Amino acid sequence: MGFTTRVKSEASEKKPFNFALFWDKYGTFFILAIIVAIFGSLSPEYFLTTNNITQIFVQSSVTVLIGMGEFFAILVAGIDLSVGAILALSGMVTAKLMLAGVDPFLAAMIGGVLVGGALGAINGCLVNWTGLHPFIITLGTNAIFRGITLVISDANSVYGFSFDFVNFFAASVIGIPVPVIFSLIVALILWFLTTRMRLGRNIYALGGNKNSAFYSGIDVKFHILVVFIISGVCAGLAGVVSTARLGAAEPLAGMGFETYAIASAIIGGTSFFGGKGRIFSVVIGGLIIGTINNGLNILQVQTYYQLVVMGGLIIAAVALDRLISK
């Protein structure tokens, strides 16, 4: 009797509040709510309109896509600094294919995305072959891919391609803009990969400890290659969406977007030291970036200050992750 009573009393005792666990699950939502509340109070007549909120989701779609790709690179304690250049080159190839007569535009889109995947594969192969840190490799390929984009475009914008392509990404389905649906579908696929497939579990294990992953039978080089292919495909998809939204392929598109990609992943709770993160938290991280940019634009704050805010958020997010993990 006494034993039963003791067990019940111990089971009924409340566990102490675990801030680290709470923040890991709900931190990004908390940050987004605070930011929305701040801008909503500063400019309710513009910021809190249905049209503006829809625009935030649409504008965030590109950031969310490259952020999800960056998430995988960071998940294995790496980084991909070439996502902006891959975005530009994939978008340029998509536009060039349509101008060359590739029809329907879906075929040109697939071509652009495949280019993104191929560029990601180059990154992965170079990381595996040289043994250098992905920071060095992708810093170099960022310049190479950007240079190729400038060469094939003669440093000029490319436009005049399929109106159906532009109109497709300007349309909505049951009130939801196509770029938003596009991003959500990709997020669902990547969520399934990371939570329901062995490949995803292996990637997490690789990020946690490469040596342990190797000795447990995980093919480290193969998974690093896959990670960078995923990053490249996501950047390629972002390039397609960006080209459609702009109505032109810009050789300098995506300049500095690696900052947004990293910020989306880190603010979304992905550990910069690898092995921890959730894909839908990265989606919220991308929305946070989009909301901040939108709010600052409404308040007529110069773009330069937006970069200052992004840099500060990255430092704060990494510092908080380090503090919580101790």
UniProtKB/Swiss-Prot annotation:
Q: Which residues are exposed on the Cytoplasmic face of the membrane?
A: 1-18, 92-101, 146-149, 194-221, 274-278, 321-326
Any idea where this protein resides? Cell inner membrane
Which GO BP annotation is one of this protein's?
A: D-ribose transmembrane transport
Q: Which residues lie on this side of the membrane: Periplasmic?
A: 40-70, 123-124, 171-172, 243-252
The superkingdom of the source organism is Bacteria
TM annotation in the entry: 19-39, 71-91, 102-122, 125-145, 150-170, 173-193, 222-242, 253-273, 279-299, 300-320
Q: Which UniProt keywords apply?
A: Cell inner membrane, Cell membrane, Membrane, Sugar transport, Transmembrane, Transmembrane helix, Transport
Membrane-related topology note: Multi-pass membrane protein
| Pfam families, per the entry | BPD_transp_2
Mainly localized where?
A: membrane
Show the CDD domains listed in the entry: TM_PBP1_transp_AraH_like
| GO molecular function (one) | transmembrane transporter activity
Which terms in the GO cellular component ontology are assigned? ATP-binding cassette (ABC) transporter complex, substrate-binding subunit-containing; membrane; plasma membrane
> Record's family?
Belongs to the binding-protein-dependent transport system permease family. AraH/RbsC subfamily.
What is the role of the protein in this entry? Part of the binding-protein-dependent transport system AlsBAC for D-allose; probably responsible for the translocation of the substrate across the membrane.
* Protein name per the record: D-allose transport system permease protein AlsC
Source organism:
Escherichia coli (strain K12)
Which lineage ranks, top first, belong to the organism behind this chain? Bacteria, Pseudomonadati, Pseudomonadota, Gammaproteobacteria, Enterobacterales
